Amino acid sequence: MSDPKANRMVSPERRSDDVGDTALRPQSLSDFVGQQQARKNLSIFIEAARKRGEALDHVLFVGPPGLGKTTLAQIVAKELGVGFRATSGPVIAKAGDLAALLTNLEERDVLFIDEIHRLSPAVEEVLYPAMEDFQLDLIIGEGPAARSVKIELSKFTLVGATTRAGLLTNPLRDRFGIPVRLNFYTIEELESIVSRGARVLNVGMSADGANEIARRARGTPRIAGRLLRRVRDFASAADADTIDRKIADHALSALEVDAAGLDAMDRRYLTTIAMNYGGGPVGVETMAAALSEPRDAIEDIIEPYLIQCGYLQRTPRGRLLTSHAFRHLGLAEPNRDAAQFGLFGTDESDD
């Protein structure tokens, strides 16, 4: 069974070939494009903390992958003029790992924990007093000889990032004084990101070329940067000094990313429902078997963007294609009564 996100050009998750995207990242809030209200608020909080000479309150970035949570965390540290340490939830396996990180922080430093929702309960218990009182409560030894030790910590800022806020425990979520939700980017914002990236990569970019890449980037800067690097390769091979709409369209079509940002896997999913199941409804387990993909991959990787774009509905009776999907596929929409759309369905099992 294939990993459905391993080779997808439009996967918002970080890929092994994304090492070049660090050069495209903005280095300050003023360079950062999009998330206007979040940037404005962060700028005020950072300036206030700087003026008081205090550590910034703990920050939680919430949003889909690829929207700039890690970049913003690095910018926060730079704007504060303090040290930056980065790790992720799965890496902190035990309380001792967290203690080692916290005790090495200097005053007002930023500790960034990506995928913070994946911290173990034991590690979270150690994190609570560290965030609230800047103290570590550790148990040294075992059995009758065990004793509790309190360690004073430097006042630091914890910046957490999560794609799944619902998996955070309430005690952890409540300890973040500055929650920041990141949203998908507009085409105009992505055009600015693509144009800036082209300047960083020293490649010419026309306005219509930037628009073509932005329209297919699924509202996600990481995808926009990845598409830009691949389109640049096509332009270099063709000895083109400037990426225009024609070059961008040729390159992205060769990469099987269509005008709506859908790739071969998206189209295969939609076409299977349209051709094999009359547009639905069809259960997710049936689709998993038909596509030879695990259920969680379909629910977490394939479906979210299709639902966001209005191509797919999740109904009590199963997955259902919309009229928009049939138009995109160039197929005639079958006659379907209202019950098929789940308006009167009561069966919540969905396979």
Swiss-Prot record:
Keywords, comma-separated and alphabetical: ATP-binding, Cytoplasm, DNA damage, DNA recombination, DNA repair, DNA-binding, Hydrolase, Nucleotide-binding
Q: Which reaction does it catalyse?
A: ATP + H2O = ADP + phosphate + H(+)
For binding DNA, which residues are annotated in this chain's numbering? R295, R314, R319
Q: Which residues bind ATP?
A: L24, R25, G66, K69, T70, T71, E132, D133, F134, R175, Y185, R222
Give the InterPro entries listed for this entry.
Answer: AAA+_ATPase, AAA_lid_4, DNA_helicase_Holl-junc_RuvB, P-loop_NTPase, RuvB-like_N, RuvB_C, WH-like_DNA-bd_sf, WH_DNA-bd_sf
Q: Where is the signal peptide?
A: none
Residues the entry annotates as binding Mg(2+)? T70
So which domain of life are we looking at?
Bacteria
Q: Which SUPFAM superfamilies match?
A: P-loop containing nucleoside triphosphate hydrolases, Winged helix' DNA-binding domain
Entry annotated with the keyword Nucleotide-binding:
yes
Which biological process terms from the Gene Ontology are attached to this UniProt entry? DNA recombination; DNA repair
Q: What is its main location?
A: cytoplasm
Give the comment on domains.
Has 3 domains, the large (RuvB-L) and small ATPase (RuvB-S) domains and the C-terminal head (RuvB-H) domain. The head domain binds DNA, while the ATPase domains jointly bind ATP, ADP or are empty depending on the state of the subunit in the translocation cycle. During a single DNA translocation step the structure of each domain remains the same, but their relative positions change.
Q: What is this protein called?
A: Holliday junction branch migration complex subunit RuvB
